[in-house]
Amino acid sequence: MQPTRVLFKRSVWKGPHIVPLPIQRPEPGKKIAPIRTQARSATILPNFVGLKFQVHNGKDYIDLTVTEEMVGHKLGEFSATRKPFIWGKKK
């Protein structure tokens, strides 16, 4: 049996790093507010697919909607903490 992609980052006997988050599934036809979190190290689990998060980047909360391709990654991978450098014009 091959270890999954998630287990390459941590030892197999440790398992994935899971942070308990207040997850509520909305009833059909109802919307719930996005889950605000500073837990950038939380692993995205399959039951998070379709949920909306607001992940803290050190200054602001960045909106994030979880898709199937994100499963196994960390929440912090999808909210950049640094601004990209852009060459400015001289005044």
Curated annotation (Swiss-Prot):
Keywords, A to Z?
Answer: Mitochondrion, Ribonucleoprotein, Ribosomal protein
**Keyword check for Ribonucleoprotein:** yes
Set out the biological process GO terms recorded for this chain's protein.
ribosomal small subunit assembly; translation
Q: Name one Pfam family in it.
A: Ribosomal_S19
- One Gene Ontology cellular component annotation? mitochondrial small ribosomal subunit
GO terms for MF: RNA binding; structural constituent of ribosome
Its localization reads: Mitochondrion
Keyword Mitochondrion carried by entry: yes
| Family according to the record | Belongs to the universal ribosomal protein uS19 family.
Q: What is this protein called?
A: Small ribosomal subunit protein uS19m
